[in-house]
Every structure is written in C-alpha cells, then in structure tokens.
Amino acid sequence: MTDRLDDPALDRQLADHPDWTITSARTALTRSFGFKDFSEAFGFMARVALEAQAQDHHPDWSNSYNRVDITLSTHDSGGLSAKDFALAKAIDRIVG
C-alpha cells in the first residue's frame, strides 16, 4: 500500500505543480489541457499512457476533441501520494 500524503506534504508538493488543482476533499489532482486539434490531443494521451505504464500508475482521464482532462489519485491510499506528483511532473514535462 502506498502512503497517503498529509496536508503539509500536499501543500509542499502542490507548490511545485502550480498548473494542477487539488480537489476540495484533497484526494485528487486535476488539470485540463487544450491542444490544436484531436490528433495533437491523442498524441499527448499516447505519450502520457506510455509514461503511466512505465510508472505503473494510471490517470483517470477524458478526451473531447482537442481537450484532455486528467485526474490523479492513488486509490489504494484513499487520496494523494508521491506517485501522483511524480506522474504530474512527468505529464508537465511531456506537455512542455
């Protein structure tokens, strides 16, 4: 089981991820991405999928044409863990 981060740790981590929003229940991170078109959005999703598989930590996400919405949470900890912030960092690197 992965350890859930406490509130002070969440605040420290969130400071390093200013484009992400923490849910009001403090159990998930969310971010929306906009792209030029569907192909660009799908390419982004493919790159994120490969990274998520490598990290063995998978996002909840949706895609509508040029928009991708991502939610990160560690289900077995019942909230946010270091895994979520590691994947958020990788996603930020992918999107540039």
Curated annotation (Swiss-Prot):
Entry keyword annotation includes Repressor: no
InterPro entries named among the record's database cross-references: PCD_sf (IPR036428), Pterin_deHydtase (IPR001533)
UniProt catalytic activity: (4aS,6R)-4a-hydroxy-L-erythro-5,6,7,8-tetrahydrobiopterin = (6R)-L-erythro-6,7-dihydrobiopterin + H2O
SUPFAM superfamilies per record: PCD-like
GO MF annotation list: 4-alpha-hydroxytetrahydrobiopterin dehydratase activity
E.C. code: 4.2.1.96
Protein name: Putative pterin-4-alpha-carbinolamine dehydratase
